[in-house]
Amino acid sequence: MWLKSLTLKHFRNYQDAEINFHSGLNIFLGQNAQGKTNILESIYFLALTRSHRTRSDKDFIHFQEKDLKVSGILEKKTGTIPLDIELTAKGRITKINHLKQNRLSDYIGAMNVVLFAPEDLQLIKGSPSLRRKFIDIELGQIKPIYLADLSNYNHVLKQRNSYLKNSQNIDENFLSVLDEQLIEYGCRVVKHRLDFLKKLEIFAQEKHLDISQKKETLTIDYLSSVPLQDIDSIEESFRLSLSKNRKRDLFKQNTGVGPHRDDIAFFINQMDANYGSQGQHRSVVLSLKLAEIKLIENITKESPILLLDDVMSELDNDRQLKLLETISQEIQTFITTTTLEHLKNLPKDIKIFEISNGNIK
């Protein structure tokens, strides 16, 4: 798939803009704070209805405006697909082929993107929430039912935590009803995640062996807050964990176990990658990003769109080369950069946009 054109109305520092893209490599060149990343963010937003930079919808909207609209024309093997997202006072409106989508899980997945930004380099040493977010975003694109199950789980979790925090007299029977709902959706979430990581690991191992010149083997472990000796007994294990933690939950007024507390661990030659070098961290993250591309291609039979937000300068020549090899394999790619000096071995057929104070040339 590739994004043929993008139209922005009241998005960040773009009052009105329309851009036609190359089906291969597109480079946004300009100094910092000119609007390069805003364009990548708008493409990411068009695909996933969210930003990789902020949680607040208000941050998207152009100064002194009250709404925004991002539209794109997507080319896929099945044909041309118009996509639209609007943010208004009434909320968020998503459309595919000009038809309104009632649920986010109906919209997300129409356009698949893989983002590689400097903050992704914190994936290894950063907080568990970063790694859970990584799973949620990538898995949600290729398995919409995961988003529905995760949304239901988070709804019950919020309800349970609110009840623990605000009720003067806890009804143990009502809490048990909430527990059963939490178990139902929580088990689905964990099973989706385990299946995803198993598939991702296969491609990531292959990429990491190539990057490390066959010196390092990468493995990925899912660290569950609920014991996972047997996937078939996960429901009973979750139920037992909630029962054991009930006194703790009542005292702390929150839920101590479940997929919202889970984590991922990465190992290089069976040693925790958290203790590896900065170069090894970069190799692991690069392997994961390249593996995401292969996994999405394998499942959807379409290439995702690759977004590289000022990340090339973070990679040495060897890692840049591995990334550029992927770009040359007919994957539409968007790169933001302040200079072309560190971009070597680029394909000849590219499109360069010069960005200055929100103006595109």
From Swiss-Prot:
Domain of life per record: Bacteria
Keyword DNA-binding: yes
Pfam family, one: SMC_N
Gene3D superfamilies named in the record: P-loop containing nucleotide triphosphate hydrolases (3.40.50.300), RecF/RecN/SMC, N-terminal domain (1.20.1050.90)
GO annotation terms (biological process): DNA replication; DNA synthesis involved in DNA repair; double-strand break repair; SOS response
CDD domains in UniProt: ABC_RecF
Gene Ontology molecular function: any one: ATP binding
Keywords: ATP-binding, Cytoplasm, DNA damage, DNA repair, DNA replication, DNA-binding, Nucleotide-binding, SOS response
Location relative to the cell: Cytoplasm
Classification via InterPro entries: DNA-binding_RecF, DNA-binding_RecF_CS, P-loop_NTPase, RecF/RecN/SMC_N, RecF_2
Binding site residues for ATP: G30, Q31, N32, A33, Q34, G35, K36, T37
GO cellular component, as recorded: cytoplasm
Family: Belongs to the RecF family.
Function field: The RecF protein is involved in DNA metabolism; it is required for DNA replication and normal SOS inducibility. RecF binds preferentially to single-stranded, linear DNA. It also seems to bind ATP.
NCBIfam families: recf (TIGR00611)
Name under which the protein is recorded: DNA replication and repair protein RecF
The organism of origin for this protein: Streptococcus gordonii (strain Challis / ATCC 35105 / BCRC 15272 / CH1 / DL1 / V288)
This protein's encoding gene: recF
